[in-house]
Structure formats: structure tokens, C-alpha cells
Amino acid sequence: MSNNDGSLLDSDFLNKNPMEIFQQWYNTAKVHEPKSFPLFTLSTVDEMNKPHSRTMALVKYDLNGFKFCSNGNSPKANHLRNNQFASLCFYWPNCQRQVVVEGTTEEMPRHQVEAIFANGTNIEGKITNIALEFQSEPIASYDRVNEKREEIRRWMLFNANSLPCPGYIVGYNLIPDKIEFLKFNENYAHERIQLRRNDDKTANSGNESWIFQWLTP
């Protein structure tokens, strides 16, 4: 993919809400990164303030934030219960772009989580989610995981292939207070812009609820 499809210097870019910019970049990634475009790195901290990162899949995004789901029994869920601050990093190498989001997480209403689970088309992923009630717990062998998956498949045969959303699946919405867009350039003069919510009058005025700053690459 050519990276000459627009510059962060464009005034049209700077006048947009950052979520609109993200939508534009995300749609481009869908075309050029068809298998990995929804993936991001979620970073949280534990009770000892030690960082932890893992790859997640974005479920949805809108003007209110970035949505993703997790096992409520997992370490990351425990991290977010104790510390609601988190960051997301999207990296699309074919597009030569990266987006880093920082903000506060909140749990999504139960009916929204169930709707997301019901509308998901990855049946094998659903089966695995149900089988792995206690995520990240030590196990003696993966044989037990496969046995549990087969038990669920047999259950589906007698229940119209339906899969209810497990109670331990939790949905999160990350409300951004800072979004950074990075466009890699061949001459290493990368373009990097940060949009954030605050009252710093020294920064440039962007969208009505955001201000922007250029950052060195």
C-alpha cells in the first residue's frame, strides 16, 4: 500500500473528531489488513502497578468509545476492576499506521453484551469462550479443554444449535481521553499527532471537545 494517500498536515484531517479519523483509518485497514484489522494490544496494570499486555479483538466503536469483551474471571478483568485506566494500540503494518488510545473503561450493560454474543458469527470462538470459564488458570492438559468443547457441541445438538451468553463474559467500553495517530513515512520523518481532552490553552484548537498537538516522531 502506498502511504501517499493523505497527510496528517491536511486541515481537513485536523478539523475532524478523532473518532471520525479512526473510522477512516479503520476502514482502510479492513481492506489492506483483512485478517488482523480488528486486533489491538490492550494494556492494563495489576495491583502492584505492573503492566500487562495482550492481543484483543475490537467488537465495536462509536463516538462514545471502543468496545471489547473479556472473561470476567480473567486477570485483565481483575485489573480493570481495580484500575479502570487502560490503553489500546492498533498497529496496521500494511497501512504503515498506528493508533494509540488511552482512557477509562466502564462495563457495558448486560443486554448489550448478550446482543454482541448472539450476533457473533464465530461459532468456534463462542464454544471456546464457554469452555474456558476460568481463563488463564493453570491446566494439566489441553485434553480437558477439548473434552469441554465436545460437551458443548453435543449440548448444541439438542438445543437448536443455540449458545447462550455465559454470565462471566463481560463487555467494556473504553472512553478515550487521548488518541494518538502515527503515520510512518519512508524517510523516517513520521507524522505523529495527539488529540486529547483538556483545557490546555497552549495547544492548537481542533474539534470542539478536543485539542491537538504535534509530537516528534
Region annotations inferred by a language model:
Residues 1-217:
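Binding-site signature for planar aromatic cofactors or substrates
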